[in-house]
């Protein structure tokens, strides 16, 4: 038996490729010459394969750390509660707040700026969404709008995987599974109305995708005699 057969295998190749793409995006240089993932303070948004915004978040620990936890095995509340399925994320957009880079994570004034930035981004993506909604469990508290810094956006799915991941049948199956898992969480716990809204939003997203897939499928629905099976 070859020695290699006794060695533990790493992550699947497609997962490794996506993680590599995530690192490449976070290593892109901002206009100030710094890697965008190294911004300590910032706001981020995730988009699906249709370009629809699906989630907004903030961090004061580092964009790289927070985004990686969402999209890899390091669980976040949003992933654990089946609010966000990392499989749905095709693009990331980030708004680094470089002016706060040297501020302590507990700095009150900096937190106010971060909260304003997140609220501004939240309103921005809601206007971009054809559903008028994202999957966040709660609304971002209203604050004074902030002039946002220049954002950077990129696709995290390698070209060789994109068409497979975007295939509507794959996405329908995945989204239905996520909805079932979220519905189970809701049935077993006392949850917020926001989580029920997330379930509703996911159901609407699934209905649209399933309807689009049905309408683009050629042929007619079969007709059978009573008692016959297709």
Predicted regions: what they are:
Residues 60-68:
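PAPS-dependent sulfotransferase catalytic domain
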